[in-house]
Amino acid sequence: MAARLEFEKPVIELQTKIAELKKFTQDSEMDLSAEIARLEERLSKLQDEIYKNLKPWDRVQIARLPDRPTTLDYIQYLFTDFFECHGDRTYGDDAAIVGGVAKYHGMPVTVIGHQRGKDTKENLVRNFGMPHPEGYRKALRLMKQADKFNRPIICFIDTKGAYPGKAAEERGQSEAIAKNLFEMAGLTVPVVCIVIGEGGSGGALALGVGNRMLMLENSTYSVISPEGAASILWKDSSLAKKAAESMKITAPDLLELGIIDDMIKEVKGGAHHDIKQQAGYIDGILKETLKSLLQLNAEELISQRYEKYKAIGKVSVEDQYIGVN
């Protein structure tokens, strides 16, 4: 069992030793249960110590793991009767965005999210989770449909950013993102956004204008990657770890700053260790969030959403607030 992340090495070493002792016990008549129990207790304490003191760069690495749960993974556990819709009715379909109608605890909802692959083959199909304009237009089509039929909208955010290629620019990437921001601000139904992995720049924000913004504990949300910030600030992308420390891109930091509304805890070691349990954590907060938003009428939902984003960018100077409008 190889450690994929540097800070996981002590955990992996102990897990490997426990596995070896268990195998030895099976292959021999020796009783090592006491030693195994002692090591398992030590492992639990070590995991608590490591995962409760993760640095921002550690969380960035967890958010990028190939086997981290995706939008479709969570749809499988959180929703029933999911029916995926395809195409933007203008150009084509984009596999980097998935969306459709489903039932959440019996209630009709619209679910939309970025979708990346878990291996090279799937990533090529999903364009590594980086949407083209048609992906964002598909998302907007589904949002307008939800608005028409009074269905709450749940958006899962997990992208490095919108695809920056020539073809995407020619088909109006910036316009597609801007149109989503504009239209989402005026939706008359509850909109809940959840960052489940990387939330990169405008590509993330195009699904991120909601009444509530939630983040998984080891996800990130930023205007640029740590590598990109390091390249701009210090002309050296290898200083990404330093950039991550100062950018305030993790859920704990963003919750403290008031950018997000709640942080969803992750299973020990990260969401990829137990998708079903992680979906349960999301379900608990999502259910309560929707319950509170469903008490608001259309005018109140729009007003609350407007005030939420208007408040971002205000700073206190000598007890006076200066708004960045």
Swiss-Prot record:
Residue intervals of the CoA carboxyltransferase C-terminal domain: 38-292
Pathway: Lipid metabolism; malonyl-CoA biosynthesis; malonyl-CoA from acetyl-CoA: step 1/1
Keyword Methyltransferase appears in the UniProt entry: no
Catalysed reactions, semicolon-separated: N(6)-carboxybiotinyl-L-lysyl-[protein] + acetyl-CoA = N(6)-biotinyl-L-lysyl-[protein] + malonyl-CoA
Record bears the keyword Lipid metabolism: yes
Subcellular location: Cytoplasm
Gene3D superfamilies assigned to the protein according to its UniProt record, in alphabetical order: 2-enoyl-CoA Hydratase, Chain A, domain 1
Biological processes per GO annotation: fatty acid biosynthetic process; malonyl-CoA biosynthetic process
CC terms in the record's Gene Ontology section: acetyl-CoA carboxylase complex
Pfam families in the record: ACCA (PF03255)
GO MF terms held by the record: acetyl-CoA carboxylase activity; ATP binding; carboxyl- or carbamoyltransferase activity
EC number per UniProt: 2.1.3.15
PROSITE patterns hit by this protein: COA_CT_CTER (PS50989)
Alphabetically ordered keywords of this record: ATP-binding, Cytoplasm, Fatty acid biosynthesis, Fatty acid metabolism, Lipid biosynthesis, Lipid metabolism, Nucleotide-binding, Transferase
Source domain of life: Bacteria
Family (UniProt): Belongs to the AccA family.
Function field: Component of the acetyl coenzyme A carboxylase (ACC) complex. First, biotin carboxylase catalyzes the carboxylation of biotin on its carrier protein (BCCP) and then the CO(2) group is transferred by the carboxyltransferase to acetyl-CoA to form malonyl-CoA.
PANTHER family: ACETYL-COENZYME A CARBOXYLASE CARBOXYL TRANSFERASE SUBUNIT ALPHA (PTHR42853), ACETYL-COENZYME A CARBOXYLASE CARBOXYL TRANSFERASE SUBUNIT ALPHA, CHLOROPLASTIC (PTHR42853:SF3)
Quaternary structure note: Acetyl-CoA carboxylase is a heterohexamer composed of biotin carboxyl carrier protein (AccB), biotin carboxylase (AccC) and two subunits each of ACCase subunit alpha (AccA) and ACCase subunit beta (AccD).
Protein name, UniProt field: Acetyl-coenzyme A carboxylase carboxyl transferase subunit alpha
Native species: Bacillus velezensis (strain DSM 23117 / BGSC 10A6 / LMG 26770 / FZB42) (Bacillus amyloliquefaciens subsp. plantarum)
Phylogenetic classification of the source organism: Bacteria, Bacillati, Bacillota, Bacilli, Bacillales
